[in-house]
Amino acid sequence: MLILTRRVGETLMIGDEVTVTVLGVKGNQVRIGVNAPKDVSVHREEIYMRIQAEKSNPEPGNA
């Protein structure tokens, strides 16, 4: 895992088209902004895990 230090207002690049900007820090929470092309999915980990679980175990009638 690459670990980086950024201050509020600073940005990091992921590849050529994705940017992650630190918008604010309050206590133990960090607000970040992600700019990515529309074809790149961006999710919080807990949402991504729920999506993956739903793909593995679709509810009856939702297939």
Swiss-Prot record:
Pfam families: CsrA
Statement: the UniProt record of this protein carries the keyword Repressor: yes
Keywords: Activator, Cytoplasm, Repressor, RNA-binding, Translation regulation
GO biological process, alphabetically ordered: mRNA catabolic process; negative regulation of translational initiation; positive regulation of translational initiation; regulation of carbohydrate metabolic process
GO CC term (a single one): cytosol
InterPro entries from the UniProt entry: CsrA, CsrA_sf
Annotated GO MF terms: mRNA 5'-UTR binding
Domain of life: Bacteria
Subcellular location, principal: cytoplasm
Record localization: Cytoplasm
Function, in words: A key translational regulator that binds mRNA to regulate translation initiation and/or mRNA stability. Mediates global changes in gene expression, shifting from rapid growth to stress survival by linking envelope stress, the stringent response and the catabolite repression systems. Usually binds in the 5'-UTR; binding at or near the Shine-Dalgarno sequence prevents ribosome-binding, repressing translation, binding elsewhere in the 5'-UTR can activate translation and/or stabilize the mRNA. Its function is antagonized by small RNA(s).
PANTHER family: CARBON STORAGE REGULATOR
Family: Belongs to the CsrA/RsmA family.
Subunit relationships: Homodimer; the beta-strands of each monomer intercalate to form a hydrophobic core, while the alpha-helices form wings that extend away from the core.
Protein name in the entry: Translational regulator CsrA
